[in-house]
Swiss-Prot record:
Biological role: Intermediate capsid protein that self assembles to form an icosahedral capsid with a T=13 symmetry, which consists of 230 trimers of VP6, with channels at each of its five-fold vertices. This capsid constitutes the middle concentric layer of the viral mature particle. The innermost VP2 capsid and the intermediate VP6 capsid remain intact following cell entry to protect the dsRNA from degradation and to prevent unfavorable antiviral responses in the host cell during all the replication cycle of the virus.
Processing after translation: The N-terminus is blocked.
Official protein name in the record: Intermediate capsid protein VP6
Protein source organism: Rotavirus A (strain RVA/SA11-Both/G3P5B[2]) (RV-A)
Residues that coordinate or bind Zn(2+): 153
One GO CC annotation: viral envelope
Length: 397
């Protein structure tokens, strides 16, 4: 894997810097590195593809070295270099695709394609070994079963979940009380509602709670907490739990009271925040517990009192909500996030070449399915294919 990264890094630098008019002295070190790559690869044969519709391709390396010059690189020099670069880039691209479409239930962190296994031979270590990539560094750690650490921006840690619970209901669905939520990606939005605006609740206060377990532990997380849930701020028609009917939700938004967010690890509270909004942080956690209250306004102008009458019919429904968004965090496991296109890269290649469903990943690389059942086998395979996708993205956009 590190050899593949070193190949890709060398080729990227060569493609960017070996251009007509450049002083040879400015790229002499790169050209020496490039020649070392050619020397190491010459005389070797590889085969890629042969799974799904990914075609079989044979690769033979027999290239001349780039020479030295006292002056600028001319058009002939650059054209010779470009022909070699293009062949190598095509080779790396096909090795990456061949690796990204394969999976294994056992030791899925190790190379699965014949071409990448061959590149793991000791003789290829002479290709300017480079371990500067976060993905390569963590792949080496995971391969030795040592602790890894990935930094993510808006990590997709929450499987998609959109539903509701009713703490008070009737067949007519005309005086409901409960919670509804939408968890997806890096964001939780939860709303508590009471059609009667807590008229019969103790002290005219309704208490709500929303608990979200994570599939992996997050550490050093920067989080945004807001006293609102905008996705539940407009009228909608909702299917009943049994699917027999529908009910109308017409929210009027109030500010939540006594808001508390707890971050827990193995059932123990690690961080707690009360009535604090904006940016907060959490050290390490595997569960988030949100609690908040809906309080009936003790004093109301006539216009507000019309919205919240003391008896039915309740045409407007008092609602309070919270939004929690994980902006950045560290995780030992690889995740899809907002700053990378690795999941899309892997998925698009598997779709383009009609790769059959294997023993590890769900059909279509469905992320909700994958993260909901994030087994050690899936974790190993996903880290490997994401590492390869990160290497491919250096050359192929």
């Amino acid at each position: 894997m590190d050899v593949l990264y070193s190949l890709s890094k060398t080729l990227k630098d060569a493609r960017d810097k070996i251009v007509e008019g450049t002083l040879y002295s400015n790229v002499s070190d790169l050209i020496q590195q490039f020649n070392q790559m050619i020397i190491t690869m010459n005389g070797n044969e590889f085969q890629t593809g042969g799974i799904g519709n990914l075609p079989i391709r044979n690769w033979n390396f027999n290239f001349g070295l780039l020479g030295t010059t006292l002056l600028n690189l001319d058009a002939n020099y650059v054209e010779t270099a470009r022909n070699t670069i293009d062949y190598f880039v095509d080779f790396v691209d096909n090795v990456c695709m061949d690796e990204m479409v394969r999976e294994s239930q056992r030791n899925g962190i190790a190379p699965q394609s014949d071409s990448l296994r061959k590149l793991s031979a000791i003789k290829f270590k002479r290709i300017n070994f480079d371990n500067s990539s976060e993905y390569i560094e963590n792949w080496n750690l995971q391969n030795r079963r040592q602790r890894t650490g990935f930094t993510f921006h808006k990590p997709n840690i929450f499987p998609y979940s959109a539903s509701f619970t009713l703490n008070r209901s009737q067949p007519a669905h005309d005086n409901l009380m409960g919670t509804m939520w939408l968890n997806a990606g890096s964001e939780i939005q939860v709303a508590g509602f009471d059609y009667s605006c807590a008229i019969n609740a103790p002290a005219n206060i309704q208490q709500f709670e929303h608990i979200v377990p994570l599939r992996r532990v997050l550490t050093t997380a920067t989080i945004t907490l807001l006293p609102d849930a905008e996705r539940f701020s407009f009228p909608r028609v909702i299917n009943s739990a049994d699917g027999a009917t529908t009910w109308f939700f017409n929210p009027v938004i109030l500010r939540p009271n006594n808001v508390e967010v707890e971050f827990l690890l193995n059932g123990q509270i690690i961080n707690t925040y009360q009535a604090r909004f904006g940016t907060i942080v959490a050290r390490n956690f595997d569960t988030i517990r949100l609690s908040f209250q809906l309080m009936r306004p003790p004093n109301m102008t006539p216009a507000v009192a019309v919205l919240f009458p003391n008896a039915q019919p309740f045409e407007h429904h008092a609602t309070v909500g919270l939004t929690l968004r994980i902006e950045s965090a560290v995780c030992e496991s690889v995740l899809a996030d907002a700053s990378e296109t690795l999941l899309a890269n892997v998925t698009s290649v598997r779709q383009e070449y009609a790769i059959p469903v294997g023993p590890v990943f769900p059909p279509g690389m469905n992320w909700t399915d994958l993260i909901t059942n994030y087994s050690p086998s899936r974790e190993d395979n996903l880290q490997r294919v994401f590492t390869v996708a990160s290497i491919r993205s250096m050359l192929i956009k």
